[in-house]
A protein has these predicted regions:
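Bacterial signal peptide processing site
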Residues: 24-27
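Short, solvent-exposed beta-strand/turn "edge" segments of beta-rich domains on protein surfaces
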Residues: 55-71, 82, 121-123
């Protein structure tokens, strides 16, 4: 059972601190690693990153000076018998030289129809495709795209489950 939206957001905030610490100091040996095109099976859904590109502009959004946009196209397919509340922040991006307080690991705010919404329901057996857009330093070329499971255990934070890491090198 997935954590309620408020608890999930708090859980992600807490997990982000751990995740970002891990990204700046090397990979966690318990992470499951995947590559572009692999289908990843989580407790609630399968997802596949079908394309990743770097650009200075996407859908009218222009990257800040010194940054680039990394556009991750993915397909999600529910494997859970109940609706699952999803957030764009469920998927985070990181890079080797990233500082712990860098908020660019989260997708930019929803601004175009191609993006996955900030919050949405993934119905049983539903498939959904969209993009997540991240603004990252333009001197970076390799990224880790991460999803962390959290299970409802009666606490505000939830119990962490598996973490899935996909190594991505965007095409320019």
């Amino acid at each position: 059972k997935k954590v309620a939206p408020i608890g999930k957001r708090l859980a992600w905030v807490l997990a982000s601190a751990l995740l970002l610490t891990g990204c700046s100091s090397g990979q966690n040996d318990t992470d499951q690693h995947f590559s572009l095109g692999d289908t990843v099976s989580t407790a609630w859904f399968d997802y596949t990153v079908t394309e990743v590109e770097s650009t200075q502009e996407y859908g009218g959004y222009i990257s800040a000076q010194g940054d680039q946009l990394v556009v991750v196209e993915l397909t999600l397919k529910s494997t859970y018998p109940q609706a699952v509340t999803m957030f764009d922040s469920d998927f985070q991006i990181s890079w080797d030289s990233m500082s712990q307080d860098d908020t660019r690991c989260m997708p930019v705010e929803y601004y175009c129809d191609q993006q996955l919404p900030t919050e949405y329901e993934l119905a049983p057996r539903e498939s959904r495709s969209g993009v997540l857009v991240y603004q990252v330093p333009d001197d970076q070329s390799t990224f880790q795209f991460t999803f962390q499971e959290f299970f409802d255990d009666g606490t505000q934070e939830g119990r962490p489950g598996d973490q899935y890491v996909m190594d991505l090198t965007p095409q320019a």
